[in-house]
Amino acid sequence: MAMLAVSTSSSRCVLHQPFDSTANATVIDEFRAPACERCAGNRGIEFSLRQGSSLFSASDGVVSFSGRVGQVEYLVIATNFNRRITYGRIESSVVRVGDRVRAGQRVAVSTNSFYFGVREVDGAQVRYVDPNRYLDTSATFAKTVLVRDENAFHGGRSERSSRTALANAC
């Protein structure tokens, strides 16, 4: 029997993981909401991971920014549902501003640390949110189910393509 995580979140948005298991990622700094727009906090999650790891688009969207801010390389993807996915401390981007990307598509290469942030945009109001709210990684967002045949469970599709289909709604 295969063990699979199935989303049970009330939200229709489940983002694709920005890296795969070969990255050996470890959280080094959790999301901490700032008290005000310019107040201290951590507006995303920071990971330690294997340098040169592939980074993947968390959702369908369009690359809205790719470049340096200060001495840090960033990539931002504007999703189809008014979210901005930020990849920071990347080594390089493999996509350019204006490129359409699909959930699960390789978009960048990591350094040995990586920042992942999510902003929700409502008109002129921008709000940083905890990426864990959308990543299908915690027990609060998923339950484990036992199935005899993984392919039958996914209708003949792989687990990865099923997760990607969920990310298309973000």
Outline where the language-model segments fall.
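Surface-exposed, glycine-biased beta-strand/turn segments
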Residues: 5-73, 102-103, 129-170
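Conserved beta-strand positions that form and line the central face of beta-propeller blades
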Residues: 46, 76, 86, 109, ...
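Glycine-/small-residue-rich active-site loops that bind phosphorylated ligands and cofactors
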Residues: 52, 92-93, 123
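Short histidine-centered loop motifs in beta-beta connectors
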Residues: 56, 80-106, 134-136
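Zn2+-dependent peptidoglycan hydrolase active-site motif and core
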Residues: 57-92, 114-117
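Short, charged/polar, Gly/Pro-enriched secondary-structure boundary elements
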Residues: 123-129
